[in-house]
Every structure is written in structure tokens, then in C-alpha cells.
Amino acid sequence: SSHPLENPTFLTNIFECCSILIIPMAMIWALGFYLKRKKFGASIFAVMFFAYIVGVGINTYYEMNGNPAIDNMGIAQENGAMEGKEVRLGAAGTAFWSVTTTVTSNGSVNGMHDSTMPLSGLIEMLNMQINTWFGGVGVGFMNYYVFIIIAVFISGLMVGRTPEFLGKKVEAKEMKIATIVALLHPFVILVGTALASYLYVHNPAFVESEGGWLNNPSFHGLSEMLYEYTSCAANNGSGFEGLGDNTMFWNYTCGIVLILSRFIPIVGQVAIAGLLAEKKYIPESAGTLKTDTATFGAMTFAVIFIVAALSFFPVHALSTIAEHLSLYI
């Protein structure tokens, strides 16, 4: 999406970003409309939009402030970190797009994500690793629905109320399925990255036989491998293109990750819906935990952050965060 015939100006760049988001955003409000629970739809939208705006803010800040390694060479960076970016779109336009394309299963890029600053890469990956904000092609916000089930169950236990969602009891069976679905995503990403890292270190002959994978070893090389599996698992399609990934190893392993992370969660989510549909409707009472409040929205955000985001903290500490510290300290 950086070709001048498609995206010629900063204005068209903003318009295309809004086009990417408009249907996923509208689906959240449609959920509240069809359930006749508009406050519930609004609370979901608020959580997702908050995460999106934070991501846009962080990426824009670091891209507009430039690369300290280039500063140390005495090169002025009035326009920000412009490596891998279109001059007519600028660092801010690329930062905006990079977050927009990763909070949805869009995958298009208008600049090279591999050339963004380390914490910008962290945000891009976290959007896909959390795999919840605004949903994406084919699955919508089904992953957010899983975290709602977990949040309802935990919140109910914390305050001593019966866990209920849309008038249906949430019990152990639904919780087990939701937990498996929530943990599968980090599992396939981290196992794939660990396997690739192990082969790179312990079987260099195999890596060389495939033409060598990494043009950027060390911290950024790990980020490239992590991004590859993250993008596959999230059905995104963007990549850190410094990785030589058009090989037998990457095509087969990424295909396996894509299949597992695409279809197993859908089966689990539909199973939860089926289990809840079979249960008797329970009218709201004084003991019902309300799911359309700001408090529950904050609880859901906390569950998403703890279960999804923190699962990836160790690998980010060795890749994006370590690279950031190497530049700024």
C-alpha cells in the first residue's frame, strides 16, 4: 500500500487506514445493537480503542523522534526515522498504518516494519500476539469473546457472584475451553520461534543450506523470527523482511502454525457458544455480575494483558526490548 498510484498522499493514507478499521469497528456496535445491549458494545469498543490509541501514540512518538544510532553519526533527522519509509507519507503516516494493519488481520504495509524502531516493532507484534483488538478477516472479535468468558469467570469468583454471560451460567467446561484457546496462540508462536532459534544456533549447516535466514543476527534477528510466526498465527501476512523466509523450513512450519492457530480456536469458540446456547436463560438479579460497565471493561483489559501480553514478555526482553536498550543506553 505504498505505491503512488494507490496511496499517493498523506490524506489517502489516512483514508485507507480508516477504511481498514471501519468494518471491524462497526461490528462491535452491531453486536451491541443485535443483543439489545448497546452499553455492552460500547464497553468493548472503549477497551479496544484505548489499546489502539496507545499503540498509535507509542509508534508515532518513536518513529518521529528518529534513530539515535543515526543521530550519533551526525545526520539530522527532522522528519523522523525515515529508513524503509515513503517520503511523501512520512514517519507518522507509516506508524499510523503499522498499528492499524496489525490490530486487524489486514497485513498490508506502506513501509518496512523491519526498519521501524524496536518498540514500534514491539507494538506491532503485541497487536498480533494479543490478537484481539477489533478482530479481523473471518473471525471478527471471537478472540475477545474468549477473554470475556475468562474475565466473567474470574470476576465472579473474586466478588462471590455466579459467573454469567448474557444470562447463561459460565461453568468449568466453558472455562477450560476458553483457557486452551487463549493459551494456544502464544504456544504455537513461541514453540515455532524456539525451534527456529535452536536450529540457527545448533545446526548452522542446515540454515546455510537454505541460504542463511538472518541478515540481522542478535536481538533483531530474534525479533524477525518471532514476527514471522506471530504474523502467521494471527493470519496477518506482514513480516520483518530481513528474514530469508522463502525456504522449505519456513514455508512448512509457518503453514502448520497458520492451520493450528486458525482452526482450533474457531472450533473452541463455537463449542463455547454451543454449550452456552444449551443452558437455561437466567434473568438478571442483584447477584448478576454486569458486563457492560467500565469496571468490567477494565477487568477484561487486565485479563488480556496478563494472559496474552505477559506470555510474550520473556521473548520480547531478549529481542525488541533488548534492542531498544542497546540503542538508548
Regions found by a protein language model. Give the residues of each.
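Membrane-proximal intracellular helices of multi-pass ion channels
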Residues: 1-329
